[in-house]
Amino acid sequence: MTGPTSPASTQPRVPDSHLDPLTRPLHGVLTTMMPDGQPQSSLVWVDYDGECALVNTTRQRRKGRNIEFNPRVSLLIVDPADTGRFIQIRGLAELVEDGALEHLDRLTRKYTSHPCYYGFVYPVEQQALETRVTCHIHATRVTLDAIHA
């Protein structure tokens, strides 16, 4: 498990004005750091548990491997109905295996009309080849657009 270095109680909070981009089915861009220091960005499904922004990946995918190497990440979500409205969460990512498949299936229902990920969105055979993790992003900084902040 990759964990944050700062206690959750001191992390910046997402203001009520910008909770909806985290709870609506809007896509985010998660940026992680490659071992050579180059940024790597991925389009991701996003969730929020009241403390952390959540995304789902595998330990085998590039973003999962990058987080294992360096837990510093950035998540950007832009409201497609008002592209001047956004939230950026910078922080430390914690990869958690427990409950990750259930989290992925919740995201699948949120973002698609399918009941679960494997067998509908992705081949069921792939499930045995992957170790699913929920990426908990412990915020060190929350940035909002200036217009709606």
Task: Label every model-predicted segment.
Residues 2-33:
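Short, conserved active-site entrance elements at the starts or edges of catalytic domains
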Residues 2-13, 80, 85-149:
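Charged, gly/pro-rich active-site loop segments
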Residues 14-18, 63, 103:
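Hydrophobic alpha-helical segments typical of transmembrane helices
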Residues 18, 26, 51, 85, ...:
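A generic secondary-structure signal marking the coil-to-beta-strand transition
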Residues 19-20, 45, 65, 125-127:
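Short secondary-structure boundary/capping segments
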Residues 24-25, 70, 131, 140:
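Structured helix-beta-strand junction loops
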Residues 25, 71, 107-111:
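Alpha-helix boundary/capping residues
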Residues 25-59, 65-67, 73-77, 86-89:
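Short beta-strand segments
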